[in-house]
From Swiss-Prot:
Gene transcribed to yield this protein: TMDD1
GO CC annotation, single: membrane
Compositional bias (Basic and acidic residues): 62-73
Main location class: membrane
Region annotation Disordered: where it falls in the sequence: 62-106
Name of the protein described by the UniProt record: Transmembrane and death domain protein 1
Superkingdom per UniProt: Eukaryota
Cytoplasmic side: 240-317
Organism placement in taxonomy: Eukaryota, Metazoa, Chordata, Craniata, Vertebrata
Residues in the Extracellular compartment per record: 28-218
Membrane found in the keyword field: yes
Bilayer topology term: Single-pass type I membrane protein
Gene Ontology process terms (BP): signal transduction
Amino acid sequence: MAARTLASALVLTLWVWALAPAGAVDAMGPHAAVRLAELLTPEECGHFRSLLEAPEPDVEAELSRLSEDRLARPEPLNTTSGSPSRRRRREAAEDPAGRVAGPGEVSDGCREALAAWLAPQAASLSWDRLARALRRSGRPDVARELGKNLHQQATLQLRKFGQRFLPRPGAAARVPFAPAPRPRRAAVPAPDWDALQLIVERLPQPLYERSPMGWAGPLALGLLTGFVGALGTGALVVLLTLWITGGDGDRASPGSPGPLATVQGWWETKLLLPKERRAPPGAWAADGPDSPSPHSALALSCKMGAQSWGSGALDGL
C-alpha cells in the first residue's frame, strides 16, 4: 500500500511539473542573465528586449491572417522605409535628445538595462518565447546553448527528485541466505603446446603385386596395331594414287584419248584384210584355179575404192 502511494505521488508530481510552463529561469539564473546580455551586440540587445517586452502574439489572429480569404485579397504596400525591427533598433539607439549615441554608451546602457530587467522577469518568461526572441535577433547559437542548459538542469532535477524514493544503502532488505556453492570439479589444465613433441608416423606401403607380364600385353598390342595401321594406310594411298593417275602407263584409262589415227586420202586404197591374214602370192597358185587370184582381189579393191570416192564426191556436192 505504501509503495502504491509513493508511486501515485511521483506520477502526480511529474504530471504537474510537465504541465507547468517552462520558464527561462530554469535554463539560466542571475549570472546566466548577465552573461546573456554580454553576448549580445547593442543592436541585438535592443531588438531582443523589444521582442520580450512586446505582448504575446495572438494565435487566433495569426491564423485568421494566414487564412485563404485574407491571402486572396492583396495587402496594401507599406510605404514606410525599413522594417519595424530596424525602426525599433534605430529608435532604441537614439537618445531622447534625438542624437545618435556612441557605440560605447549604447552597449553599456543596453546590456545593463537588459540584465537588470531580465533577472526579475525570467520567471514569467517561457522558454519558447525566449528562444524565439533570440532566433529573431540573429543569435540562434545562444538559443541552442540555453536549450542544452535547460535539458541538463531538468535532467538533474528529475534525478534529484527520484533520489528520495530510492531505498537507502543502510536500510536495504536483507538478502536471503544463499546456499553454499557446490565445489566445482577441478578444471582441466590447459595443454602446454610448447612442451609437446610432433611425431610423424608413416604407414607401411603394400607390396607391388603386378608382374612383368602385365605390361608386355599392352606393348605388343600397341606395336601390332601401329604396324597394321601403317600397312593399311600405305596400301590405301598407293591404290588411290594409281586410280587417280590412270594405271601404270602400259594402257590408257577408259577416259583418256587413244593413239592418233592416220588419215587416208581418196586416192589411197584401204586394205580389206589385215596384215596377219594376208597370204603370200605363191599361196594363190597352190590353191587351185577356183581360188581367187591376187589380181582379181586388187581389181575388187579398186572397184570398191572408186565407189567410195564417188559417194564421197556426191556427199561433197
